[in-house]
């Protein structure tokens, strides 16, 4: 079996970049710009002296800016730092809104009552904060009359203008015509 491996000319260029910050003995430079445990600037010191200061304070020496010349290191409690970073990441994920896209399918020759039902579904989705993808499905001879689909989507957009705005205008995609509606963002009170 032959296995092909793709190499990229721009990837890494021989530099290994770790997702984790280097700490204590893993820092392999002769001197660093040191920041104290309270945020005060200590200055440029030899790495041995920086490690000794961190050891005396019963803290870790953490490389916070490895690309600087010389690299910037800070004396801190690395376990606490990692815990707080994980808490912030978890909090930011929790505050992110999941965008849900609902789909409502219609036919170009839809009856009035059916249209009202579909329109009410679209309004309900928009009120809940979901985006709605409205799809008009053409079949047979209906494909020769795309203007029916445009008119129907325009009518729907006008009917739900108080609840949603058109994010993607109507466009033909094979046998279907689609339009995306997004909920109206209410201003913060």
Swiss-Prot record:
GO BP: ribosome disassembly
Paired cysteines (S-S): none
Keywords: Cytoplasm, Initiation factor, Protein biosynthesis
Assigned protein family: Belongs to the IF-3 family.
Organism of provenance: Corynebacterium glutamicum (strain ATCC 13032 / DSM 20300 / JCM 1318 / BCRC 11384 / CCUG 27702 / LMG 3730 / NBRC 12168 / NCIMB 10025 / NRRL B-2784 / 534)
Taxonomic superkingdom: Bacteria
Annotated function: IF-3 binds to the 30S ribosomal subunit and shifts the equilibrium between 70S ribosomes and their 50S and 30S subunits in favor of the free subunits, thus enhancing the availability of 30S subunits on which protein synthesis initiation begins.
Protein's name in the database: Translation initiation factor IF-3
Keyword Ion transport: no
Lineage start: Bacteria, Bacillati, Actinomycetota, Actinomycetes, Mycobacteriales
